[in-house]
């Protein structure tokens, strides 16, 4: 049986890479501009795990597209994606890095 210390060492740290975290891309299509305040509030809540974000206004179609790159544990990514998915007037999809790749 692993000691408490060696369990956390093996689970979270190996060769300078934090384990248990994954990279994910969250794509958001905003059809209702009034949802922007709620989206920004949620993104601010999870700002510690956001690597970067890019917003593109697509005026010809009347939508905005937001791409958010995150580096966090699965449950954090799912919580963020779930909260965003509950906002009216937007569509959210999340793409995860394969488990074990560079982790």
Predicted feature locations:
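Long, contiguous binding/interaction regions
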Residues: 7-103
